[in-house]
From Swiss-Prot:
GO CC, one annotated term: plasma membrane
Domain of life the protein comes from: Bacteria
Membrane-topology annotation of the record: Multi-pass membrane protein
UniProt xrefs under NCBIfam families: PRK13661.1 (NF010182)
Major localization listed first in the record, in broad terms: membrane
The protein's name in its UniProt record: UPF0397 protein LCABL_04350
Keyword Transcription regulation part of the UniProt annotation: no
Ranges annotated as spanning the membrane: 12-32, 45-65, 77-97, 112-132, 150-170
């Protein structure tokens, strides 16, 4: 008998559907920033939302696969350092899914602030430091180019996640029945 718990059907379905939605958003719902290969990308708001609902494994694979599919279909080959970093962003945000517990129907101001602090720190570290450094090590890209791209991405992804992700989480939580809200009538 297996000691490890396999991925649930719910998580696998979330990965499949989430990857498809992320791919569509990355492909068709972006605004160019004027910096090469850098966009204002609302898919990061969706990734923050879906990672908060389904956890780190789903967050990683949705980010990784959705970004890889977009790069493959748009450019012919994935830019693996940024694909990995997108997966990492989804995973880190997903690590806190139990803390946010959106399924309980409560995503108030305290959780909104916590979510946004988490996603800003995650986006800044991931896009300003990790992705550009990997670009230099793996692809021998010029440092000034990739760090500018990374900083612009950190800012735009933080804003997109802060606005879109927060709206999605608050709206979703409002559709859930709050725990303890149902009372037996006398």
């Amino acid at each position: 008998m297996r000691d490890q718990k396999a991925l649930s059907v719910r998580t696998v379905v979330a990965i499949g559907i989430g990857t498809a939605i992320l791919f569509i958003l990355k492909r068709f719902a972006v605004i160019p920033t004027g910096i090469a290969n850098t966009n204002i990308d609302i898919s990061y708001g969706f990734l923050g939302f879906i990672a908060t609902l389904f956890g780190p494994i789903a967050g990683f694979f949705i980010g990784f696969l959705g970004h890889a599919l977009n790069d493959f279909t748009q450019y012919g080959t994935p830019w693996w350092t940024w694909v990995f970093t997108t997966g990492l962003v989804g995973m880190v945000i997903g690590l806190f899914w139990r803390r946010f517990n959106v399924e309980a129907g409560n995503f108030g101001m305290k959780k909104i602030v916590s979510f946004n602090l988490l996603q800003i720190i995650t986006n800044v570290v991931s896009w300003s430091l990790i992705a550009p450094t990997l670009d230099i090590w793996i692809y021998s890209e010029p440092a000034n180019k990739v760090y500018v791209q990374g900083i612009v991405s950190a800012i735009s992804n933080s804003i997109a996640t802060g606005v879109i992700g927060t709206i999605l989480l608050v709206t979703y939580a409002a559709t859930r029945t709050r725990s303890g809200s149902l009372k037996k009538e006398s």
